[in-house]
């Protein structure tokens, strides 16, 4: 009782208004403007202003130990050079108080933060972090404030992070001592942001979205930067942009959590007080004026080699709506968007996608309330050229119909129920989610207090709804007119070649300018090479400079013993059940795994399609629209997916199966179970519409898959490389890797006349065993709900098929792969991975292997692959449960050099004289993940999903804390150097096939042939 009472008092103390200044009162140079308690979110909001500069500060006091900080600036881009984006990078490269190279990245292993990053949005830039440690919070806040307000902004940092012209392989120039090969001396564009944005522009979905933004917001330029314009940015322009925009008068500061506001204000106020007030950049750019009637724009984009060439148009129709500071209307328009488009039963899905006009929504589809005026867009991808005009006509027809018919109250209630559950669900990153929700609107003048007022907004909405015709009136007001922008992107088979040719021409022009300034071609080349070598020398200082100025937490701050999650196991419902009793705010969380033995490969690979299909087809008795309505009204969502895991004591063994999950209010748990059963057992694969609906699912998955790979190409490369090493990795790659991509695109390419009988027969096979057999379950709920949940679980289990489906036993799995594999894909940059087998989770060597991965990433690979090589990212990783150690690179312009760095990294680690500080940094870095806060429904899941007991975790915790330098060198020698010498590695790269991909590589074309 005493502990609970104390906890309640602590919560009241954090959010109790009486402990804070009253409006008009001052604290550490700030004046409190207003404050408000928001009971539905269990928080108190305080809005302050810095007296001297006018900087705004929003503090959210809440009983949450995962505290958040962010400082942001209004950064309207003046052009398409990406100056806000490049400035975001260069501010983090050194500051007055921390005058070392890259303090941001060097802080990563010196903090226990669970989130650290920086983001460039269309009209603002912000720098957030989250941590549970008070000293860590102070350390990071000091680094962030100094980086943004007092950056060094050295020219070498601008050329490294922004753009430059230099020899393709400067390391070879150094090694060759003046006798470098012509290909190494070839002059190319370089720069981290330049290569990042080249990678972005390879993504057709991003290209469509950014070009749409260019036309709907002609006054807002591309803040990320267009590679064709980035090379126009000068160092002087960068410095001026910082002076004009990164000023407290133009800043918004956000703090969240249970740490004292006074402590934050004391530190922040001291940093801001050195500035004088200036005129802030508060301009809120409006979208295009469409009041004079329709406008049409047609542009060209890349062609997708894995999708039907006749179905690659993307098109959308957009309206400009009212001001987003009307939060009730903005909420209502977001609800209209959901009612029109969410789910397979929604009117726009049925009228546009189910009818065959397109395969999926366009990237800009939906209601965008991030600007001063809202934008409502409806569009499709996967459209045939002759159908492009039909899309707009069909959209307008459906909107008129919904204006006249109206929306069923049950569908509105389902949406509101999802919001209720969202408020009740206790996430581990609530503060960061709140920041992302409030921030964009705050920067365009929407009052954050209005955005926080959930109950007030819902009450006002209900009042309007009760009057009748409210939502229909909004459709009539904003969407039943032709004041539209129709935006279309057509596929061009020459787009990529034209892009490459443009870059060559631009490079020649820029080199000519350098030649003119230098006096001769020889002197120009010498100057560019000298600058590159100077940058290389500057970058080489990174591993030798004194980091004593940087603050840090210490390993001694990490508790040696971790509190266990109390779990209970029983078989009362005829299945093995793990119970976790915890405060869940009246919610019950459910998971189940049906373990499958000897599952044939051809069935496993179709499980993703099966899980999509049961959420699409409906049953004999209920349409999918009816099922979706029930899911929204009675649950927080139900899902089915594939699950596999290595055995913690033997990584060569693996189990696999289907996983089921759901969340509901306690009173709706029986309905949640019944919905899961209906979806899995009763889905009607024999309905006349089944083949067409499955084909549409395949086409939606295939549409834009090249873009999906581009956004996380290193993850696909890793999965492909790892699949040749362990059984579990092979299984995962089959359902979520390039093998799955190949299968989906091949099935999607089958002719419309194909009834997909072979596919449907296999999906029905999966249905027979999906919920039959070796089921085990896990439930997280309040103690008072256990009895009712146990009864509901028993009824659920009794309703399931009783006989398990068995498959013939198989021989030992064969998952051997070529040592080096290359996948040709149409990207301007590369993604790569090198993976090696190691040891099982419980093996003592796994702790030093994980420390080694951090040491290599932070002390070597980031420096070599990103800073010197120009890739957007690169590093090392250890997967202890899977028994894998590996390397990766992301948006990489220099794959040959990167692969060389990866292969030499093990020997580098063996030869390196590691310091105690190095080891300390690596351990701290590992524990960021080990001790990251977890949502209540994630507690105990390591044991349920992977068989990792608290004893195993505690043993590993102690081993991580006790790792020595000798152990690091030993595992580097044994599991990296020796393994590479033995040819144990698997290497995979994705990208454009060039001369360096010689006969030593197995080239795997992503061809499609329509087979399963």
UniProtKB/Swiss-Prot annotation:
Gene Ontology CC annotations of this record: mitochondrial intermembrane space; mitochondrial matrix
Single GO biological process annotation from the record: protein processing
Enzyme class: hydrolase
Positions annotated to bind Zn(2+): 85, 89, 196
Localization: Mitochondrion intermembrane space; Mitochondrion matrix
Annotated catalytic residues: 88 (proton acceptor), 161
SUPFAM superfamilies: LuxS/MPP-like metallohydrolase
Keywords: Hydrolase, Metal-binding, Metalloprotease, Mitochondrion, Protease, Transit peptide, Zinc
Transit peptide as recorded in UniProt: 1-13
Cofactor note (record): Binds 1 zinc ion per subunit.
Pfam families: M16C_assoc, Peptidase_M16, Peptidase_M16_C, PreP_C
Cofactor(s) required, per the database record: Zn(2+)
EC code(s) of this entry: 3.4.24.-
Any one GO MF annotation of this record: zinc ion binding
InterPro entries the UniProt entry points to: Metalloenz_LuxS/M16 (IPR011249), Pept_M16_N (IPR011765), Peptidase_M16_C (IPR007863), Peptidase_M16C_assoc (IPR013578), PreP_C (IPR055130)
Self-association and partners: Monomer and homodimer; homodimerization is induced by binding of the substrate.
Role of this protein: Degrades mitochondrial transit peptides after their cleavage in the intermembrane space or in the matrix, and presequence peptides; clearance of these peptides is required to keep the presequence processing machinery running. Preferentially cleaves the N-terminal side of paired basic amino acid residues. Also degrades other unstructured peptides. May function as an ATP-dependent peptidase as opposed to a metalloendopeptidase.
Similarity comment: family membership: Belongs to the peptidase M16 family. PreP subfamily.
Protein name: Presequence protease, mitochondrial
Origin species: Neurospora crassa (strain ATCC 24698 / 74-OR23-1A / CBS 708.71 / DSM 1257 / FGSC 987)
């Amino acid at each position: 009782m005493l502990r609970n009472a104390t906890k309640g008092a602590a919560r009241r103390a954090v959010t109790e208004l009486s402990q804070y200044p009253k409006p008009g009162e001052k604290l550490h140079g700030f004046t409190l403007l207003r404050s408000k308690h928001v009971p539905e979110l269990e928080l108190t909001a305080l809005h302050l202003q810095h007296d001297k500069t006018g900087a705004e500060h929003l503090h959210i006091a809440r009983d949450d130990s995962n505290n958040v900080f962010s400082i942001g600036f209004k950064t309207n881009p003046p052009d398409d050079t990406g100056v806000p984006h490049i400035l975001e990078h260069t501010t983090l490269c050194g500051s007055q108080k921390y005058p070392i190279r890259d303090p941001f990245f060097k802080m990563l292993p010196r903090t226990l933060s669970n989130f650290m990053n920086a983001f460039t949005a269309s009209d603002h830039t912000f720098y957030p972090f989250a941590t549970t440690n008070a000293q860590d919070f102070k350390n990071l806040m000091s680094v962030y404030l100094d980086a943004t307000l007092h950056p060094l902004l050295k020219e070498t940092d601008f050329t490294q992070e922004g753009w430059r012209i230099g020899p393709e392989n400067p390391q070879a120039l150094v090694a060759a001592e003046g006798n470098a090969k012509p290909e190494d001396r070839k002059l190319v564009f370089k720069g981290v942001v330049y290569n990042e944005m080249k990678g972005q522009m390879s993504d057709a979905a991003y290209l469509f979205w950014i070009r749409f933004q260019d036309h709907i917001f002609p006054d807002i330029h591309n803040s990320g930067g267009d590679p064709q314009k980035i090379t126009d940015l000068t160092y002087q322009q960068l410095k001026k942009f910082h002076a004009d925009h990164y000023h407290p008068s133009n800043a918004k500061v956000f703090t969240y959590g249970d740490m004292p506001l006074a402590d934050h204000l004391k530190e922040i106020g001291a940093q801001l007080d050195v500035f004088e007030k200036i005129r802030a950049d508060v301009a809120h750019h409006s979208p295009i004026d469409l009041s004079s009637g329709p406008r049409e724009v047609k542009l060209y984009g890349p062609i997708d080699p894995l999708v039907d060439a006749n179905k690659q148009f993307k098109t959308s129709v957009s309206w400009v709506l009212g001001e987003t500071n009307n939060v009730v209307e903005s909420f209502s328009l977001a609800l209209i968007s959901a009612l029109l488009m969410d789910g397979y039963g929604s009117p726009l899905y049925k009228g546009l996608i189910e009818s065959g006009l397109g395969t999926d929504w366009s990237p800009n589809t939906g209601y965008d309330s991030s600007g001063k005026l809202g934008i409502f867009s409806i569009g499709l991808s996967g459209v045939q050229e002759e159908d492009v005009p039909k899309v707009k006509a069909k959209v307008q027809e459906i909107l008129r119909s919904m204006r006249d018919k109206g929306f069923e109250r049950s569908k509105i209630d389902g949406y509101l129920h999802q919001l209720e559950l969202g408020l009740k669900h206790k996430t581990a990153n609530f503060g960061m989610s709140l920041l992302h929700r409030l921030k964009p609107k705050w920067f365009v003048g929407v009052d954050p207090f209005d955005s926080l007022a959930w109950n007030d907004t819902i009450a006002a909405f209900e009042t309007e709804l009760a009057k009748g015709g409210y939502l229909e009136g909004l459709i009539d007001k904003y969407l039943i007119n032709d004041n539209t922008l129709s935006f279309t992107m057509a596929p061009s088979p020459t787009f990529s070649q034209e892009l490459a040719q443009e870059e060559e021409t631009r490079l020649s022009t820029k080199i000519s300018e350098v030649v003119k300034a230098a006096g001769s071609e020889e002197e120009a080349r010498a100057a560019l090479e000298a600058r590159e070598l100077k940058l290389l020398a500057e970058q080489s200082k990174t591993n030798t400079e004194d980091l004593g100025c940087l603050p840090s937490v210490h390993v001694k701050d990490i508790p040696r013993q971790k509190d266990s999650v109390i779990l209970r196991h029983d078989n009362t419902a005829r299945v093995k059940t793990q119970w976790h009793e915890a405060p869940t705010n009246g919610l019950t969380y459910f998971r189940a795994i049906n373990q499958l033995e000897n599952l044939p490969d051809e069935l496993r690979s179709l499980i993703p399609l099966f899980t999509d299909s049961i959420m699409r087809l409906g049953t004999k008795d209920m349409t999918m629209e009816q099922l979706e309505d029930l899911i929204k009204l009675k649950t927080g969502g139900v899902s089915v997916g594939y699950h596999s895991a290595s055995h913690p004591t033997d990584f060569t063994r693996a189990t696999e199966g289907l996983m089921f999950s759901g969340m509901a209010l306690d009173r709706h748990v029986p309905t949640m179970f019944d919905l899961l059963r209906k979806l899995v057992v009763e889905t009607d694969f024999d309905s006349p519409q089944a083949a067409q609906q499955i084909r549409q699912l395949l086409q939606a998955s295939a549409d834009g898959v090249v873009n999906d790979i581009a956004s996380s190409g290193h993850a696909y490369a890793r999965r492909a490389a790892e699949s040749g090493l362990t059984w579990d990795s092979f299984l995962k790659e089959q359902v979520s890797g390039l093998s799955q991509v190949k299968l989906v695109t091949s099935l999607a390419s089958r002719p419309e006349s194909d009834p997909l009988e072979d596919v449907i027969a296999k999906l029905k096979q999966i249905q027979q065993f999906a919920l039959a057999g070796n089921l085990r379950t896990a439930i997280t709920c309040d103690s008072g709900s256990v009895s009712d949940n146990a009864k509901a679980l028993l009824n659920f289990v009794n309703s399931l098929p009783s006989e398990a489906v068995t498959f013939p036993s198989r021989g030992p799995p064969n998952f051997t792969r070529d040592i080096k594999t290359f996948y040709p894909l149409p990207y301007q940059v590369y993604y790569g991975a090198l993976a090696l087998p190691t040891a099982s989770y419980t093996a003592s060597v796994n702790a030093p292997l994980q420390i080694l991965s951090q040491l290599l990433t932070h002390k070597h690979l980031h420096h070599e692959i990103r800073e010197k090589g120009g890739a957007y990212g690169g590093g090392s990783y250890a997967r202890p449960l899977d028994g894998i150690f590996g390397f990766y690179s992301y948006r990489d312009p220099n794959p040959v050099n990167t692969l060389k760095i990866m292969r030499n990294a093990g020997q580098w680690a063996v030869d390196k004289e590691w310091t105690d500080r190095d080891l300390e940094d690596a351990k701290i870095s590992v524990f960021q993940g080990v001790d990251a806060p977890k949502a209540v429904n994630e507690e105990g899941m390591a044991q349920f999903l992977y068989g990792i007991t608290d004893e195993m975790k505690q043993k590993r915790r102690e081993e991580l804390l006790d790792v020595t330098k000798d152990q690091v060198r030993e595992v580097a020698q044994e599991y990296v150097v020796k393994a590479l010498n033995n040819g144990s590695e698997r290497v995979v790269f994705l990208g454009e096939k060039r001369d360096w991909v010689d006969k030593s590589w197995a080239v795997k074309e992503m061809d499609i042939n329509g087979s399963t």
